Every structure is written in C-alpha cells, then in structure tokens.
C-alpha cells in the first residue's frame, strides 16, 4: 500500500512537470511573437520618425489672404514667414498656416516667385511615384465620364491637382509638358503611368517653353518613348486634321476649342465666312464642313497656311475653303475700308499678353480686331470671337466687345458665350483654370 501511494504520487508529479513544461513553452512562444510584433512596431515608428524628420516645413505668415485656405495651390514668397533649413529646390515639403494648422504638402522652389505649389491637403498621403500614377488614373476616369476619350487634355495642371503638369492625349500618342522644377523631377512617374494605363504608341516631351527658365529649367523637347513619326492625324467632329507634335504650337493642337468649333455649325450654313488668325484652319474647315458657301482663312505664318491647305485637302474641302498669308490686323482694317462684306467673321487670336503691365495693349488689340470684324458683317451676320489671354477675365472680355460694338455703331445680340472644353476643367477659386472666352453674337 505504501509503495502504491509513492508510485501514484510520483506519477502525479511527472504529469504536473509535463504540464508545467508545456505551459512554459507556450508562454515562451507567445512572448517571442509579442516581441516580434513590438520589434516591427518599433521599426515602423522609427521609419516614421525619420520620414517626419526629413519632411521639411514651410510656415506661412499669420496675416495672409484666404486664397490658400480656400483651395488655391499657389503660395507666393511674400506669404511665407519661415522655411526650414536644408530645403532644396524641388523637395516635397509640408506647409503650415500661421496658427499652426496644416495647410498641405507640395513642392518648393525657393528661387521662384511662386515658392510652393500644393499637391494635396491630406497630411496622411505620401507624395511618391504611386501618388502620381493614381492621380493620372483619376484624370482619365474623369475624361471618360465626360466623353473625352480619343483626343483630350488628360492632365490640366492645377485643375487636376498636379500644378504645372500638362498631358495631352492624341489617340494613342501623348505629349507632356512639365513647367516647374518640382513637377519636372517626377517626369519618369508620368511616363510610367501613361505606359501602365494606356500602352501608348509614343510619348513626346514639349518643354520648349520660356516659362521653364523662370524655374531654372532649360527648354527642351524630344522622345520619352521609342522614336516615332511626330506628324500624326487625329479625328475631330467627323473631320481629320494633321497634327505636328514636334513643331506645332503649344503641344501641337488646340484641344481647348474642340467644343467651340462644333458650336458654329448652325450659323455658317450657306454663309460667306472669313476667319482671321486661322493657324492650321480648324475653324474654317469646320465651317466648310457645316455647309458654308465660301470660306477664307488668313494667318501671318506661311507654315500654318501650308498646314491649313493640307487639312482642307485631307477633308476634300479645298474647293470651298482657301487660305492666304497675311497680317490679320492690316487686312481687317483694309477690308473694312473697302467695305467688303460677309455673313460670318471668326477671330481666334493668340494671347495678346501674359503680363499685367501690358494688359491695356491687349484690351486695345481685342477691341480693334472685333470692331473691324463687326464692320465686315452684313446686317444679321455673326461674329465668332475668342480670347485665350488668362489676364482678360470673362467680364472684361464682354466689356471689350461692347466697346467695339459701340465704336462700330453696331447692335449686338449674344448667341453663345462659353469657355474651354470640359477636358480643361475649371476650379472655382483658381482663376487661372478659366482662361478661354468664346463668344458668338449676331450683329445688326
């Protein structure tokens, strides 16, 4: 009996030891797992601290306009109170208001008058390659929703929250402009995004624009893909147009007027039409396509007139529309003196100024050409006129047309007043996103 009790006792002790040992091993496993989690959290926290430490800050003055708080992405140098030491041109930085509140993240160029351009108002978003790929994908989603698929401005700078970035889509070909240092540094990301989303036939860089020099950048142009023939043909409103991506104005073609060119279809039928500042003849060829009796387009550039004639032949309209090389200001004045008349006058001049110092000259120029245009019209004729000068507001443009009508002793009735096509979206509060004014008036 005594032996049995001892045996039972030893058995219980052995079982207890096994249970205790297993518990210690399980506890050790849990401790090791917890240690691993803690180590990962510490590593992530350490990386976050490094990231935040590296993220330089810009502090704004306490008394500044509400423009930035209301959504404008530009911050001028005279609005800045302090910039952290060690900031380099092109760096991504955080911006804080004078009261300490977070304003946004963007890129900085201390040498520029516009010292910061904001990319996001969300502090949690990291500005990296994927950020821009996602943004461009969102831009494409918007264009598809609004019906701009074949040809469109895929990215319109500030309006698409990527300041100073322009990407135009011409069917399977793309043209990129990066007009500020901070956005130019991300050019490889834009090329990657286009390749991922579209599988394009070609990508071309048109950075041959003087504004880049204000950012310390050189003017340049060239292929961002395998080389291809930069002379392409696009379709617009049932017509075909040659586009020279390498040497054409801006990015090769004025996509912002594509809706406005369609707007003339009812007023040009059976009409004698004169177009000034014709460039490659897009408005004039639309007029011929929509049933005009005769169309004459004039432009000072011989190269533009040559392309316009090619476009007329491309669409089989060379017997209706013709083009001449001439100075529009001189010809309009002479024709009004000669009392030449037509049914429709179309004016699509380039920007007359990019500086507030010369805005009065621009006003005088717009008034002059519209006055002369009105004098060419038969009673009941139509004036089709545009301004792409961003410093001329829609209100000012209408005032100029009213002054021209008064001096021409004509009565006008508004038919259409609109802006650029919707692939160039307008953001309220960011005035430079609305730059194009397009007006049709009946003239008596």
Model-assigned labels for residue ranges:
Residues 270-277:
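Conserved class I S-adenosyl-L-methionine
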Residues 294-299:
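Conserved SAM-binding motif I beta-strand of class I
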Residues 157-162, 166-168, 184-254, 262:
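Non-catalytic substrate-recognition/targeting regions of SAM-dependent transferases
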Residues 52-169:
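Non-catalytic accessory regions of SAM-dependent methyltransferases
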Residues 368, 382-444:
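C-terminal catalytic and target-recognition region of SAM-dependent MTase-like enzymes
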Residues 306-341:
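S-adenosyl-L-methionine
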Residues 280-292:
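Conserved SAM-binding loop of SAM-dependent methyltransferases across substrates and taxa
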Residues 342-372:
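Mobile active-site "lid"/loop adjacent to the S-adenosyl-L-methionine
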